[in-house]
Amino acid sequence: MSTARAGDRLFTLLQQCLPTRLLSLGMYGLTRVRWKPFKNLFIRVFMKGFGIRLDEAIETKPEAFVDFNAFFTRALQPSARPLAAAPALLSPVDGTLSQFGPLQAGRLLQAKGHDYDAASLLADTADAARFTGGDFATIYLAPYNYHRIHMPLSGRLSGW
């Protein structure tokens, strides 16, 4: 994990102060614009501003992405993130460990300074009870981080 940049902390602080729902709706629309002059400029400005390189990506040409969202969630080459030999602790994402600690009475401090209930996050009270007394970790994905989430190869995704 990399250390948190000052810009990351400022970005997180701004997210707490701004009308996030409205901001999210606006960004959702902007990231799906397919008009080539706009999306190509948007991608190039973003790449330059955050120092993003595409040498690890399967698609290495910025203009080849259908929209900004396709660029932002780009796939990496299989060799880009080799797994460590067992036994090892692996992160499911690129990012910075921002918070960690014990689950206290089903509650945990989670994303962007908001307190969340484990049952709400898992959408199941019985599943949440299994984690009582356990620990949590929050990994912050900065704009320059790879934005796909991975799970262990031996895992089984049984719900969304």
Which positions does each model-derived feature cover?
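Non-catalytic terminal segments and appended small domains
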Residues: M1-W160
